[in-house]
Amino acid sequence: TSLTDSQLEQLLKSSEGWFAAVYLNLCSFSKSGELPGKTSDIYQMFSASMLNPLPEDRKEFLSAMGLADEFTEEMAEFITKREDVHQILKMLTRQNAFVTCLNDGQTYRFHHMMKECAFRAFRTLDDSRQAFYYERYGAWYEKHGAYIHALSAYRRNQNFAAILRVVQKDAGILLASLKPEEVLEVLNRCPVSVLKEYPLAILVLMR
């Protein structure tokens, strides 16, 4: 069965030009007669061929960094506390393993299929490991003034003191985009003892 023009366009878009992604998409197409969507088993196929064979520590590295849309070597070192990040990224990009270095020569990005599979693998980590990485992401983004990203990471980790600290630092500038229900959720779930430590943050949230 040949692909239609619309299917070819879909394949090009979903594969982002990665040969391995094209191959996995076509394998799925040969079995079902349809190109895979987000609900298909192509992600299981991808994980089985690209993630599962890796050593656990390498798999965890990819799982953790899959949370970021883009990242630098410095960021990956901070998030994972690994000293061999340079070697890992060099190996992955050399093998064309769904990780690419952008034109600036410093920023890396996962293919969307790798990112989705990495996130699925991340959710299988112990709660303590997930909490560790969310805390590291929050700290990185907070340090670099990316307060919306920091807030998102801290919320996933339920670190309410860090949430209010970020709100107080931002003074409502970037976080003005928060929906009212999100603000109420933070206030309702935050322990009173923590709220008392950050009165200025409460004023910012109640604007």
Predicted regions and their residues:
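Active-site catalytic pocket residues across diverse enzymes, especially alpha/beta-hydrolases
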Residues: F29, T80, F122-D126
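Short helix-capping and inter-helix turn/linker motifs at the boundaries of alpha-helical repeat units
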Residues: S2-L3, G37-D41, N52-P53, R109, ...
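Short acidic/histidine-centered micro-motifs embedded in hydrophobic/aromatic stretches
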Residues: Q10, S14, L24-S28, A64-M65, ...
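C-terminal boundary/linker of central alpha/beta nucleotide-binding cores
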Residues: Q44-A121, F132
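Extended alpha-helical scaffolding segments used for macromolecular assembly and cargo binding
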Residues: S128-R207
